[in-house]
């Protein structure tokens, strides 16, 4: 049976980084990865920013699919934290080894998101508005949601763990 990808998504300001940090501290058997962890090195390799050059997003996604495949080859389960949505994965194309994708959305209300993003250095109003639009798109695309305005990062991490355990309980 082909392994599945387990993806935790959320628009900017959704609390992905805080939830990921708390999830890693749980020391679960799952291996967590943030799409940004290879961003600087991949940009250096590509000679362009993978953060802003849309022509590099497909190859960067393909690189991550191979990293995640390596985890599965070692008999482990990876969970991938990314702002991507299902249409992004469709555009890249799922790799042949992948048996499907399970999605979990971290989300919060627009006011909370706006406050979080405005507190970040360098965030403009246009960037905040784009993040709000991204959040609305994700709400339409992903059914399973954890509200990070209602949960602490530790509670969100616990919800992520419960989601993973429910989906993988027959695989162990």
Identify the function of each model-found stretch:
Residues 11:
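P-loop (Walker A) phosphate-binding loop of NTP-binding proteins
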Residues 20-65:
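Conserved substrate/cofactor phosphate-moiety recognition/catalytic segment
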Residues 8:
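Hydrophobic anchor at the beta1->P-loop junction of P-loop NTPases
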Residues 17:
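Walker A/P-loop
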Residues 82, 97-118, 146:
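Conserved phosphate-donor/acceptor-positioning beta-strand/loop module used by diverse small-molecule
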Residues 14:
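ATP-binding Walker
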Residues 56-99:
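Glycine-rich phosphate-binding loop used to anchor ATP phosphates in small-molecule kinases
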Residues 119-162, 167:
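Small-molecule kinase domains that catalyze NTP-dependent phosphoryl transfer to phosphate-bearing small molecules
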